[in-house]
């Protein structure tokens, strides 16, 4: 990694080529310690990144020794001062110093010295690029100032430009144009050199540079000295310290930019690559623009970048220069974040004719140039298009807001419509269920109306044979005997209709009188069933008594009611069963709202716990718990942040066995106080003084509620923003317009406790002035004077919550009713389960025996059972069988309603909420009885009592329907929740639909394969189209990758990395994908390099 810079010391002669050095024999390997030490020195000189250092450190000793020998073989032979001295010698008046002239100028002319200067610069560039970092730092230090010397020589090499401008004015242009080296050089100024401003930040030549030196400089500029100088600067900038030095130099970047006036397109391309890389470093864009401002002053341009555009238009024979120029223009315009500044820079080049020239280059054959042009066009910022997009966006946003409002309105309407349809379906399901019950009752009565039916009802229904009609005489005698004993009643209708009614009371208590029979018989069926039953017999038999005497009899003889309830089924008794529909007794109905029979439970206790220990003697102290007195301390003590237990909470705990007073007597508490007293203490006072002070202050301060509770009450009252009298008056009149529901719920927490009521009563008894109380205490005093305050607050909360709660419960009950009844009444579902049972028995009966049913969770197993080829499941096969053999069952899921909604309902919670509403309505009725002049309660009861009745009826129907359908499918309603039960059917229907779609897709694919085999195969797409598609995907993928717009120069090698990245892919901003997609003309995709291909 060293340099072969030895030629700088070789004498200049006709045969100046350095002699070849013989191969150095390999030295023996030193000891391990010395080897590691020398290897560490070599690594420090190589200036490698940490990952490479770690990799080389893992080498074995043989490889380490080889690396040490290689590095020592290429030792640095010339110090930086040798190169600096030679560069300074070329800057003398005659082009070389006297000392150097005496050594090697005697036999050489000036051109020979120019060739040697180029060789020196090449060796300097190699040294800067390959030597260790210490060599570069020595070249750039304050003593050598190598950067200043290099820039001065670069300015000297470019002096021929000014000389050419002067010679252009005095010499015929035709002779100049005939020179091959001047064919690509343009006039550097449109104005005479005298018009160029003198104040420019460049390297100025001293008066010592004579006219002869300028002519010599022209010869220098025709060589590669400028190009190699730029390479040297690039090598310096590749180091972090060197880059900082270059960026902070007042004229370095300016001289690099002025190198664009060189005649070589290769040099200009190198300069533009370096300037483009500097643009992408943080803070570099401003320095580049300042350098081109200086270029404008030096070269006399009317507009900035004018000469650059002239070179771009006329150097069309050198593709590398055009690619570098296009890349620089793209970066200098579009690498800034300020959009307005981007538009300004973009317009500068548009004004110079860039857009028109790019239109001419659109059909260029160079892929590299086309990619750079397309990258610029993708980054172009079209203000007109953005304005249109802004207007369109505003219109779209307004339209989107309107659509959102419409969606919200439609969603609300859809929810209301769904709830209405759910209610209607639930009502229709209830009517359908009632109609089926009535139909079953009519069928039973019709079967009983025949003699066969009458004789069949006396013994057990299933065991009596039909031929019993051959003995009618004995049967009639038996019936008459039972009727005489009061066990049955014969009801004769019109024609030959005869019905037999069992008297359960007589069967349960044979010795009872006949007056109990009608009472029990009317109590056994429900009210809805007793009315049509009483209307069916003809007038001669006495009808059963109405329900009102039944309720009266229940109130008169409450002890006898429980033993009369068990005989209701009547199935195990010898007498025949009654012809009434239904075999199971209905659940006991809730107590009616209008009756005053059983006393309702008292309202819940008011919130708030028992009083504190200090004032809570009496009822709050548990049995066996001794009251404790507060302890007076000599010093002020800090508070221990614990959660204390109340006396009522320690019963049966370990605390009942503890005696802390005994411990206090045994310990030295004075020492405890000395160690734990607070820092802010007054003088030590005795207990008597404290008691006297407390007794003096006590009369001046009265507290009715605890401090934290008073603070929370104050916050609540501020939220209500109402006075105490206004609040209490609204509570007394049930004014929900004044008191919001949220405020009521907050205020419920501050109902006076028993302890607070005792303090309030003591305060009023002593007739103390109100000024002693705080605002919160005065409110509590006024608040506690309200009659039946807990009942009123509960009633107010109920009045405010009832409409929303009822509106929330209704759809849930309807969903349960509709889903339960639709599942139970679906014949298609029953037939599908029948098919599933058949498949299961067919598969399992030989090993496990035949099954008579299955649990509903077994439906999930249909998806798990795979076929032999593992391509389909049992559910897919079931779908195929149903589609082929039972097409009428394919739409079975349309019979099942609201499964998902019913599955999300917690029936126990809903029933609990309904019962809570019922208790709240009863409380409201009692309040209205006590205060019948309240129009608010009267209007509420009138408007919402029907709603409550409907809720009660629907809750009972929902519970019965759900239990019925769960039991109907062999499940236990106590352990099966609606979420489990309905989710089984919901999952099955969804899986069935998905299986239907998959089977249909398989059919289409099979048909396509069949038709494909019949038709000739179509030729595949050519590989070229495939490659273009992959290139397009690669290009889109590249555009989606957000590269950083600005690089950091905080490491060595940053400039080389930036230049390499720009060569691999063009500079495209991440925010230009959409705009370029709209602007790009239709056609084949851009060719992408192999580095970007997928």
From Swiss-Prot:
A lipid is attached at residue 2 (N-myristoyl glycine). Residues 1049-1082 form the DAD domain. Myristoylation mediates membrane localization. The modification Phosphoserine is found at residues 7, 184, 688, 1021. Pfam families: Drf_FH3 (PF06367), Drf_GBD (PF06371), FH2 (PF02181). GO terms for biological process: actin filament severing; cortical actin cytoskeleton organization; regulation of cell shape; substrate-dependent cell migration. Keywords: Cell membrane, Cytoplasm, Cytoplasmic vesicle, Lipoprotein, Membrane, Myristate, Phosphoprotein. It is found in: Cytoplasm; Cell membrane; Cytoplasmic vesicle, Phagosome. Residues 16-28, 535-549, 559-610 have a biased composition (Pro residues). It is a lipid-anchor. Highly expressed in the spleen, lymph node and bone marrow cells. Residues 27-464 form the GBD/FH3 domain. One of its GO terms (cellular component) is phagocytic vesicle. Residues 627-1018 form the FH2 domain. Residues 1002-1017 have a biased composition (Basic and acidic residues). PROSITE patterns: DAD, FH2, GBD_FH3. Interacts with RAC1, PFN1 and PFN2. Interacts (activated by RAC1) with SRGAP2 (via SH3 domain); regulates the actin filament severing activity of FMNL1. Plays a role in the regulation of cell morphology and cytoskeletal organization. Required in the cortical actin filament dynamics and cell shape. May play a role in the control of cell motility and survival of macrophages. Belongs to the formin homology family. The DAD domain regulates activation via by an autoinhibitory interaction with the N-terminus. This autoinhibition is released upon competitive binding of an activated GTPase. The release of DAD allows the FH2 domain to then nucleate and elongate nonbranched actin filaments. This is Formin-like protein 1. It comes from Mus musculus.
